[in-house]
């Protein structure tokens, strides 16, 4: 199972680095920072489906 450590998030701004992750909402996030901020916003209901685009 793919996991991402989001313990040091949320962050006020994310870089534009492109390393896509696919969330459990079937949405592609541009990088870990964008994904982890979304995880925090979802109160932990969003999880990582897999690395790469959905």
Swiss-Prot record:
Q: In which organism is this protein found?
A: Branta canadensis (Canada goose)
Name by which UniProt lists this protein: Ovomucoid
> Organism's domain of life?
Eukaryota
Q: Which GO terms describe its molecular function?
A: serine-type endopeptidase inhibitor activity
Which keywords fit this entry according to its UniProt record? Answer: Disulfide bond, Glycoprotein, Protease inhibitor, Repeat, Secreted, Serine protease inhibitor
Among Pfam families, the record links this protein to:
Kazal_1
Q: Where in the cell is it found?
A: Secreted
Q: Which positions does the site annotation Reactive bond 3 cover?
A: 16-17
Q: Which InterPro entries match?
A: Bifunctional_prot_inhibitor, Kazal_dom, Kazal_dom_sf, Prot_inh_Kazal-m
Listed as disulfide-bonded, the cysteine pairs are: 6-36, 14-33, 22-54
Glycosylated sites: 43
Gene Ontology CC terms: extracellular region
Which residue numbers delimit the Kazal-like domain? 4-54
Q: What's written under domain?
A: Avian ovomucoid consists of three homologous, tandem Kazal family inhibitory domains.
């Amino acid at each position: 199972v793919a996991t991402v450590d989001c313990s040091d998030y949320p962050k006020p701004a994310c870089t534009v680095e492109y390393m896509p992750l696919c969330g459990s909402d079937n949405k592609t996030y541009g990088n870990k920072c964008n994904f982890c901020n979304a995880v925090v916003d979802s109160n932990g209901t969003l999880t990582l489906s897999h690395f790469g685009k959905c």
